[in-house]
Amino acid sequence: MVAALHAGKAVTIAPQSMTLTTQQAADLLGVSRPTVVRLIKSGELAAERIGNRHRLVLDDVLAYREARRQRQYDALAESAMDIDADEDPEVICEQLREARRVVAARRRTERRRA
């Protein structure tokens, strides 16, 4: 946190037991409010319904954010490849195309499950 402050980045401090509205959760996750509602409906994010409003526990939102970040890092690591400077550019382009195909196919199957 101190490093972020020194770098001039914004830092948010909030108690860990705080509950959030869907808009606050969306702001924290960097997504739209409808996306948060969709995540709640799909069961990816836990929420309590109070009247016609959803309330999310800050710990749950932070845990989801960390899990999402880890999935992104894993996807990057999985799609990374070593490129030799002596390798033919056409071979490299074909390897990149194949990596994109694999990632796109994985996304399609994940969307079908959801």
Swiss-Prot record:
- Kindly give the Pfam families that the UniProt entry links to this protein: HTH_17
GO MF assignments: DNA binding
User: What are the disulfide bonds?
Assistant: none
Supply the InterPro entries for this chain: DNA-bd_dom_put_sf (IPR009061), HTH_17 (IPR041657), SinI_DNA-bd (IPR010093)
Name of protein: Uncharacterized protein Mb2337
Q: Which organism is it from?
A: Mycobacterium bovis (strain ATCC BAA-935 / AF2122/97)
